[in-house]
Regions:
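Intrinsically disordered, low-complexity terminal tails/loops enriched in metal-binding residues
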Residues: 21-170
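N-terminal export/membrane-targeting signals
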Residues: 1-23
């Protein structure tokens, strides 16, 4: 009996370890965002992975950069869209996720944050603590497209300030 229990725990441990290691395969394959260059491991809680029907993949840091890729590749059909769960950082199906828009937590590449959660209860708890609105993927993507002009200006301003600071240090 002890051998069976030990064997069972060993199998569970190995499967868990395999799942954890494969969960970050997308980060190894796409370590930085194609559009802004941000470190996808650092932003694992907001990263996205697009799998197109032609077999190509694109790794981004956020829904903002994913929206850009989807707009630039109108002739390619997304087969799967993955997003990092805000609370666990595991990749989940973006179209099945519960999305929170807005709130007090600063967003990634955007003024109006957009976070994905695998579980509705976790998203609702986050809402109570941080504010925002609950939506689905289509609502989050629409919000991202609505925000792109203002977000692009914000990103340009930040980068200009960073360049000025670097010049002052020289």
């Amino acid at each position: 009996m002890k051998k069976i229990i030990l064997l069972l725990f060993s199998v569970i441990f190995i499967l868990s370890l395999t799942t954890i290691l494969s969960a970050n395969e997308d980060i190894k394959k796409h370590s930085s965002c194609k559009y802004c260059g941000m470190d996808r491991e650092k932003f694992a809680h907001s990263r996205m992975l697009i799998e197109y029907d032609d077999g190509t993949q694109v790794g981004t840091c956020s829904l903002h950069c994913t929206a850009i890729d989807l707009a630039l590749n109108l002739d390619k059909t997304p087969k799967l869209l993955w997003v990092g769960d805000y609370s666990t950082q595991a990749l989940i199906n973006a179209e099945k996720a519960f999305w929170v828009i807005g709130g007090t937590k600063p967003g990634v590449m955007t003024k109006r944050a957009k976070w994905a959660f695998a579980q509705k209860e976790v998203a609702e708890k986050f809402l109570k603590e941080n504010g925002g609105n609950l939506t689905d993927f289509d609502g989050a993507l629409k919000a991202s497209y609505e925000d792109i002009a203002e977000d692009t200006k914000m990103i340009r301003d930040r980068r200009r300030m960073m360049r000025q600071k670097m010049m002052e240090k020289k």
